[in-house]
Amino acid sequence: MASYEENPQGISQADMIVAIPSYNEAEMIGYVASQASQGLAEYFGHSRSVLINCDNHSLDGTREAFMSVPTAIPKIYLATPPNTPGKGNNLRNLFEKVRDLGAKVVVVVDADVKSITPQWIKNLAEPMEKGFGFVCPLYVRHKYESTLASTIAYPITRCLYGRRVRQPLAGDFGFQGQLADKFLQCPVWTESSQNHGINIWMSTVAINARLPICQSFMGGPKVHRNEDPFAQLTALFHQVVGTIFDLMGVYSDFWRQVKWSKPTAIFGVSGEDVESPPVMGINENRLHERFTSGFEDYLDLWQQIFDQSVIHKLQEMRGLGMQQFSFPIQTWVNILFDAAVAYHQVSAPDRSTLLDALLPIYMGKVLAFVRKTERVSVQQAEELVENECMVFEETKPYLLSKWDGR
């Protein structure tokens, strides 16, 4: 796909790649490239390494900022054709380049990360020298950061495929070069997986490749450019959940055989104090408004998808005030499982409408999570997430009966 490549040092082989996908990141990419170069030089000086900027044909000077920053490690710039957006398309260029260069180890880091250090490269690459095929990061996170992972991506991935990968939507990860072929061969390559769905797509494909997977503690929070969490929520929700549901169809022979989940090895945890994550504010009124407005827009569709007992419970929740608002976990699990089955029963255009209808219910789930955890520690909030994951696993026979009865 790459329409443009700049490879001033003529690199034709590499053992290790650090890739930085980007779109209009001229402000930060030089810093990220510098930190990545230091990490490669300091911890993997024995390897033939290269930095690759996989870019969406940015027009803000990203290429110039990347190529001009002084680094000890050689650099390659790859760009998609003009007007071809999406991190997934950047990474598809990367997979092809990994194959061309014969790279054994690949690390990917986001271009806007302010908290990256050279240690990050070590943390994401070193486990692969110990035989792991895919490395997911573990950051110190605020309890309300990435509620999409806490309430959907983590519990569903864990329940379906039997691996406990806490942050499967993370944009930084490592993988063995041999996985590039698996990524290129995956039959699911949709608009969703080309965009926000790419991180969960990679995590899921890697789990199903049956290579050893681990998590690596990054030593602190991930700090990147501040954005309004609602600004891209609809697209993010559609693309992440749509990708999860799409992959359920491809990998059903595997996940239907998985009964319970197993812990995933964690690297890099020490007894040292770590920096606290930035404080996050949540607009509870906005969440409540989005939940209640869903009844006006989607009640008819909900009644087609969900059992009547679920509809009654949603109506009951609608009558709760903000202070008393709650969302029974069993109801939430049944809703997600019913939605996943319905997704595979409708045409492609109707799938988008189904995801639209699920979004306000998700808003209610996030609100309930906030209400339940606002006075507890991050650790206690994590315990709640773990307990809810067990309900997903215990309810899997319900999903199987619905799936097989389609």
Region locations from a protein language model:
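Conserved donor-nucleotide/metal-binding helix-loop-beta segment in metal-dependent transferases, i.e.
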Residues: 116-138
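Terminal low-complexity segments of carbohydrate-biosynthetic enzymes
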Residues: 238-406
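A conserved acidic beta->alpha catalytic loop
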Residues: 54-63, 113
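Short beta-strand/loop segment that forms part of the nucleotide-sugar
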Residues: 20, 44-57, 80
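Short, well-formed alpha-helical segments that are part of the catalytic scaffolds
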Residues: 2-7, 25-41
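Short beta-strand-to-loop element that shapes/binds the nucleotide-sugar donor at the catalytic cleft/hinge
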Residues: 135-147
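Short beta-strand-to-loop acidic/aromatic patch adjacent to the donor-nucleotide binding site
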Residues: 102-114
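Conserved donor nucleotide-binding strand/loop of the catalytic core
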Residues: 52, 63-89, 93, 97-100
